[in-house]
């Protein structure tokens, strides 16, 4: 078991050295992807450390996820420090192949796309799989519709952080989120 944990840690360290920004538990069953960073996050602050992260943690707890079931992933690149030439540009969307590598390494049961920028990165990374979904709106990752991609439930919220300032929008994203209870939940 220690060998598996060490291998996972090494893989995650490698991803972070190539510009991937993550926060939380890499073994979480749910990954929250944010592409439209706020000013604090753009300046190097911790991802999802503000009101949006607090609201997401509270929502996940209310839905039955454990407190440690929180993993945030930026859909835009942070600084790369592996010393090799890279196609990763800090502040730009993660390249499709790198985003896909990260998501496959994390291997969550569910993926929540918090904004349009994260939807665009997901669409690029999983274009072939999304094209195989019969319903057009689901394949386009329309907010509120759950898409099944390689056995994962994928849900776009359509601007989570902005929704926090409006009561009606908050209710809408809460209704969307309730479609992703933990696997095996009794409800």
Q: Residue locations for each model-derived region?
A:
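A polyanion-binding, active-site-adjacent surface
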Residues: 1-187
């Amino acid at each position: 078991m220690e060998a598996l944990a060490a291998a996972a840690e090494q893989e995650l360290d490698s991803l972070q050295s190539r510009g991937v920004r993550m926060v939380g538990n890499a073994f979480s069953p749910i990954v929250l992807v944010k592409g439209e960073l706020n000013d604090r996050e753009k300046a190097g602050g911790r991802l999802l450390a503000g009101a949006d992260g607090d609201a997401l943690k509270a929502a996940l707890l209310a839905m039955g996820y454990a407190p440690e079931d929180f993993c945030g992933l930026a859909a835009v690149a942070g600084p790369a420090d592996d010393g090799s030439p890279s196609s990763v540009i800090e502040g730009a969307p993660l390249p499709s192949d790198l985003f896909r590598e990260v998501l496959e390494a994390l291997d969550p049961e569910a993926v929540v796309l918090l904004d349009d920028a994260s939807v665009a990165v997901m669409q690029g990374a999983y274009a072939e799989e999304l094209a195989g979904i019969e319903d057009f709106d689901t394949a386009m990752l329309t907010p509120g519709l759950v898409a099944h991609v390689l056995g994962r439930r994928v849900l776009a919220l359509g601007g989570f952080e902005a929704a926090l300032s409006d009561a009606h929008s908050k209710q809408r994203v809460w209704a969307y989120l309730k479609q992703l209870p933990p696997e095996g939940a009794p409800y």
